[in-house]
Amino acid sequence: MFSKVSLALLLSFGLFTAGCTTRDLSAEAGNKTKVGIVFDIGGKDDRSFNAAAYVGALQAKKEFPIVLRDVEPGDPTAIEPAQRAFAQYGYNLITGVGFAQGPILTEVAKDYPQLHFVLIDSVAKSPNVASLIFKEHEGSFLVGMIAAYTNKTGKIGFVGGMDIPLIHRFQTGYEEGARYVKPDIAVLVNYVGITDTAWNNPGKGRELANSQYERGADVIFQAAGNSGLGVFDAAESYKKFAIGVDSNQNWVKPGFILTSMMKRIDTAVYSVIKDEVEGKFKGGVHVYGLENQGVDYALDEYNKPLIPQEVIDKVEQAKKDIIAGKIRVTDAMAK
């Protein structure tokens, strides 16, 4: 029986209307697979990390018989109640978006061994959790190369969100890619903060980018969630370049986004939902890198005029060399 507590939680998150009974909810679901997503505090409209997960889920909804509900907590303290609300109602697949949800999701998954869970950007050692991990350092190496080939000042920049090992992986790959092209290039580095709020502070992101542009950087790679939108604003203001992250963000500020380091979170989320619907869910660690199109750089109508073909050719060759093991990119989280 669906408890009054969990119903109250679902209502508080706006998942269902107050007039909707559990019988109504069961009728709506029918034989459909119930999928719940708990985003991080950046929300699904961040045009980056969360948005990519949402795109993948929406694509799955179009193709498969699922009921899809989501929660945008807005505050870290709301994450656990949201996960538990989905679990108490018996959602078949519950996704936690972002490494910060790892400890909570691990405990919730243990309490509900009959359900399946997805954790993005962290590893939960539980057989009913699919942990989706990306080789961000590989994709960051490629955009670092593009930044260096574009650079005219001898300085480029990096603005990270929360100062944590996961984002160091982006930074290190970017630095190594840039120095693969220009060994003496200087990389200016700043982080928005050390708490979860660092992902949702565009004003601080813009402030840091302004400083880097003032100090001579002409390309800045942001790996900062919603805070990265402030970096884009600075790029437009200074008429310099920025590099997007997670999703293809080239369209956000056309002409000022040099490229984007894409994590195919959309593809990964779609795939795990597909597996759940087809009865093929597999727990454990799922790794996405260049070799399986899990990461890449974005090239489209918005940025093709910004990158010469000879640069694209060199980056494509480097991609092949990374896949073949001829170029080894440091994984900052493996140190």
Residue ranges and their predicted role:
Residues 16-19:
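C-terminal motif of bacterial Sec signal peptides marking the signal peptidase cleavage site
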